[in-house]
Amino acid sequence: MAELACFCYPHLENDSYKFIPFNSLAIKCMLTAKVDKKDQDKFYNSIIYGIAPPPQFKKRYNTNDNSRGMNYETSMFNKVAILICEALNSIRVTQSDVANVLSRVVSVRHLENLVLRKENHQDVLFHSKELLLKAVLIAIGQSKEIETTATAEGGEIVFQNAAFTMWKLTYLDHKLMPILDQNFIEYKITLNEDKPISDICVKELVAELRWQYNRFAVITHGKGHYRVIKYSSVANHADRVFATYKNNAKSGNVTDFNLLDQRIIWQNWYAFTSSMKQGNTLDVCKKLLFQKMKQEKNPFKGLSTDRKMDEVSHVGI
């Protein structure tokens, strides 16, 4: 994750802003600079290489002292920064909006995936600039639309029916902020269209998840798509979702947290997010993740959750 101010800076033209991507040498200069505390939140002028991000965001970049940041000296950083600028320059951002826009925290990996989709000549985003910009605006929180299959970050498609597409995320192969844990495995499920879904499509998805992905929990981050994650990473996702929800509420970026379909979401996660929306503390909410829930009546007749050991999927072992 990183703020948009880590990728570009605003330049006032008439009564709105144009956004310009940073270059890696300007960032490198900023990372070595001694800057007064009162200037930490201001864009840094490298004199030689142009404007650089505010020094307060130093930890967002990979250095000898910090291996958890972005690999900003890669060509992928330039591609992501340019893509963000193209999207922001396609809309009107005024003086009253600019600080709020640049402080928005976005998923670096999501944006790298959109670059990969854009570069794939078999992908619809390669052929449609309009759809590409729409996908980026959704990714950076500048659109109220949800991420559907056409505008999704992408990955490897492992399941699809008339209503849903399930993607295996490919973060292990990334350049900008790769996941280094070789055991990482995670999926995302997007809606093919933002419209009511038939019970038969939901039943098909639930059957697939229970049969092939019974070692995973189905959760949501509240943005209109599902995530399929290992049970061991549930607590980590809960911390992130809770922190983001509280930060958005504090900064006034209040967007409705979409709980999605209770028949698909893991029961404990649904309880956690419902409790969070009611204003409870993190500790109170997280207890619900590890509490034995009363088994709800199966909404789909004939779809059993019981499996013999030799029938259980080995995905995720």
UniProtKB/Swiss-Prot annotation:
One of its GO terms (cellular component) is host cell cytoplasm. SUPFAM superfamilies: Rotavirus NSP2 fragment, C-terminal domain, Rotavirus NSP2 fragment, N-terminal domain. ATP binds at residues 107-109, 188, 221-223, 227. InterPro entries: Rota_NS35_C, Rota_NS35_N, Rotavirus_NSP2, Rotavirus_NSP2_C, Rotavirus_NSP2_N. Its main location: host cell. It is an enzyme of class 3 (hydrolase). Its cofactor is Mg(2+). GO terms for molecular function: ATP binding; metal ion binding; nucleoside diphosphate kinase activity; ribonucleoside triphosphate phosphatase activity; RNA binding. Keywords: ATP-binding, Host cytoplasm, Hydrolase, Magnesium, Metal-binding, Nucleotide-binding, RNA-binding. The active site is at 225 (for ntpase and rtpase activities). It comes from the Viruses. It is found in: Host cytoplasm. One of its GO terms (biological process) is viral genome replication. Residues 205-241 are annotated as: RNA-binding. Its EC number is 3.6.4.-. Homooctamer. Interacts with VP1; this interaction is weak. Interacts with NSP5; this interaction leads to up-regulation of NSP5 phosphorylation and formation of viral factories. Interacts with host DCP1A, DCP1B, DDX6, EDC4 and EIF2S1/eIF2-alpha; these interactions are probably part of the sequestration of some host SGs and PBs proteins in viral factories. Participates in replication and packaging of the viral genome. Plays a crucial role, together with NSP5, in the formation of virus factories (viroplasms), which are large inclusions in the host cytoplasm where replication intermediates are assembled and viral RNA replication takes place. Displays ssRNA binding, NTPase, RNA triphosphatase (RTPase) and ATP-independent helix-unwinding activities. The unwinding activity may prepare and organize plus-strand RNAs for packaging and replication by removing interfering secondary structures. Belongs to the rotavirus NSP2 family. This is Non-structural protein 2. The lineage of its organism: Viruses, Riboviria, Orthornavirae, Duplornaviricota, Resentoviricetes.
